[in-house]
Amino acid sequence: MMMMSLNSKQAFSMPHAGSLHVEPKYSALHSASPGSSAPAAPSASSPSSSSNAGSGGGGGGGGGGGGGGRSSSSSSSGSGGGGGGGSEAMRRACLPTPPSNIFGGLDESLLARAEALAAVDIVSQSKSHHHHPPHHSPFKPDATYHTMNTIPCTSAASSSSVPISHPSALAGTHHHHHHHHHHHHQPHQALEGELLEHLSPGLALGAMAGPDGTVVSTPAHAPHMATMNPMHQAALSMAHAHGLPSHMGCMSDVDADPRDLEAFAERFKQRRIKLGVTQADVGSALANLKIPGVGSLSQSTICRFESLTLSHNNMIALKPILQAWLEEAEKSHREKLTKPELFNGAEKKRKRTSIAAPEKRSLEAYFAIQPRPSSEKIAAIAEKLDLKKNVVRVWFCNQRQKQKRMKYSAGI
């Protein structure tokens, strides 16, 4: 008997009555005589020979027209609507009882395809990550299959759209998966403008600082990238974009810790005060570091950094720059201490000379004898009193001016 496929959308066609082959389950239909009305046969066989029979003569005529009982609807005839009733009976005979779950086969196909896709992804991922050290975190399968629901396919058996993976998409799903992430995680290079603000955590999700300070793009599914702090990676990209040295770019994860930022800000403030440099001097001195893209900063920016009122991203971005300036300032300060004649020649201030009382009484005695001693006499007095020649000369000069003032005051 011809069965209509569940997955087919072809219209049902009524086969010719003479081409049907009689099966044993309808043998009761052919046991009745063609001329009888067969009132008891339908209850024992199937709905195909139900109460569509008309009069006795009409039933006989229908049986004779069927070729001697070769039609399963021998009793289905009548006056005007016998032909239509026979077609409806044949349709019910050909259609089996529908199962309770018409999507049973579809569910099995969905499960089989999902398992095949999972096997392909896991094998390919294990091959692509075999070079990673064993201390990395294990691969998480639940992050692999999120593209399964992005390939909707319409089932041929129903008009509803079921989110399954079409067989033609199985070969390209894995490529699409990596292709999508390859474009999504490209490191941005738009950090050459403003230093502050607009530091997004996603700028460096696919980048890491290499040994020479360059940014190296890594696969999006590398397990160690999932464990890194996004703020730390943003600082890495910032350090590379502004041309900082490689040792400044290779920051540790603890740099993103607010407690470490607070400790650095306090240490920076104390060192700045000890060096005798103002916040405005720090901001203007940053331009002398010759860092590409970093010019002078305002005094308020340095103040906000020291008071921890900047945003977390800006604190991370500004920390390596201020740290580089602090290292340069302390280096210059140490050089000034070791070689003061090179740096403090113009700024050196002469200390006030203080003469003790015994030396002062001796000088007054010499002044009473000779207010204007010669250069040789001044050198002898300086050697005797263990004073510098210039100090003795200046003292005699000042003492003469003092005597003039006293005489002028006495004359008035």
Curated annotation (Swiss-Prot):
InterPro entries: HD (IPR001356), Homeobox_CS (IPR017970), Homeodomain-like_sf (IPR009057), Lambda_DNA-bd_dom_sf (IPR010982), POU (IPR013847), POU_dom (IPR000327), POU_domain_TF (IPR050255). A motif (Nuclear speckle targeting signal) lies at residues 174-188. It is found in: Nucleus; Nucleus speckle; Cytoplasm. Residues 54-70, 78-87 have a biased composition (Gly residues). Residues 253-330 form the POU-specific domain. The keyword RNA-binding does not apply. One of its GO terms (cellular component) is euchromatin. Residues 31-53, 152-169 have a biased composition (Low complexity). One of its GO terms (biological process) is cellular response to oxygen levels. The N-terminal transcriptional activation region is sufficient to induce transcriptional activity. The POU-specific domain and POU homeodomain regions are necessary for DNA-binding activity and transcriptional repression. Tissue-specific DNA-binding transcription factor involved in the development and differentiation of target cells. Functions either as activator or repressor modulating the rate of target gene transcription through RNA polymerase II enzyme in a promoter-dependent manner. Binds to the consensus octamer motif 5'-AT[A/T]A[T/A]T[A/T]A-3' of promoter of target genes. Plays a fundamental role in the gene regulatory network essential for retinal ganglion cell (RGC) differentiation. This is POU domain, class 4, transcription factor 2. It comes from Rattus norvegicus.
